[in-house]
Each structure stands twice: as structure tokens, then as C-alpha cells.
Amino acid sequence: MSSHLEFKSWVGFPIEKVFLFFADPANLPRLMPPITDTRIDTVRLVPPPVTSIQLTSEQQRSLAGIGSEIVTSFRVLPPLPLRGRWVAKITAFRWNEFFEDVQLQGPFKSWHHRHELVSEVREDKQGTLVIDKVAYAFGLGPLDPLIEALVSKRIEGIFTHRQRILPDLLLG
């Protein structure tokens, strides 16, 4: 059985800036709640498709296109020191619209995360609607509903944290 969650937030920044931020794996630990102590262990980047967007040489070297793999570690049950490993792969990428990642190895039987961005005006200000769509499964049979009740709250907490700190991170 697969579970689905969707999170939306709006930030008062242009879509190009927001997309570049999310497409750089180095920003992932900054988006996570500090208690998770998320770290990037290794990254194998595949450059995104060529675009007419002007990128600095640093941006060209740091963005994750299709085929990129990011290995992270995190505290499984904060504040306990036990660390888990997560291997993610970028499977889809369209400039300033979306990218998708799947879990190759980690705590779930399956995990699919689509990061969508939509240019949107609110109160006469141009900004970006950030939409995160997550589908995941545990594969634990009869234990799935119990685990789902616990884990969905934790996932919601992570995305609430991301939504709260994203504007400040984009300022920096």
C-alpha cells in the first residue's frame, strides 16, 4: 500500500532562484530540521540538460540533473545517535518546472518525491508556489498502518519546517 502526501507553500522569490536552490543538493541539509543532523555523505552529479539560463560556473558544477545520486545520513530517532542512510536518484528534470527523486536505498520500501514550482502572483507580488508531492510505502504488511500513523506526522513536520525556513534561506 502506498501513501501520498502533498505540501504547498508560496515564497516571494522568482521561480528561477527557487529552482536553482532546490536543484543544488548542498541545500538539502539546510532544509532539514536541525535535530535530524542530516549530512551529505557522497554526491555523484550528472549535469542538468543544457539551457538558455545563464549559470555561473559554480552553479553548473553543483546542480543535480537526471541520473545524479545523493547519499545522505540522518538521525533515525533524534536525539539518539543512531544514523540511517538514504540513497536518492534524480529521475526527472525540467528547468524551472519540476524535478523528481526516488529512494534507491533507505528506510522505505519505495519513495518518490516530485518537486514542482509554479510562478504565481500574490498580493501584486511575483513569487513561486512550491509543491512537494510524496508517495511512499513501507512494505511491512499488517504493520503498515501503525508505522504510517507515526511516520506521516514526522514527514509533515519536516515539510512544515522547510516551508517556514525557505524564505530566509533564499535571502542568503
What are these regions (language model features)?
Residues 1-56, 66:
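Hydrophobic ligand-binding cavity/cleft-lining segments
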Residues 4-6, 82-87, 109-114:
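Short, surface-exposed coil-to-beta transition loops
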Residues 11-13, 74-80, 92-94, 107, ...:
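Beta-strand elements of well-folded, non-transmembrane domains
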Residues 17-22, 28, 70-72, 90, ...:
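Hydrophobic pocket/interface hotspot
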Residues 40-104:
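Glycine-rich portal/gate segments that line the openings of hydrophobic small-molecule binding cavities
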Residues 100-157:
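Beta-strand/loop substructures that line and gate deep hydrophobic ligand-binding cavities in soluble
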Residues 112, 160-161, 165:
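K/E-rich alpha-helical interaction surfaces of small helical-bundle regulatory domains
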Residues 164-172:
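Charged phosphate-binding loop/patch that engages nucleotide di/tri-phosphates or the phosphate backbone
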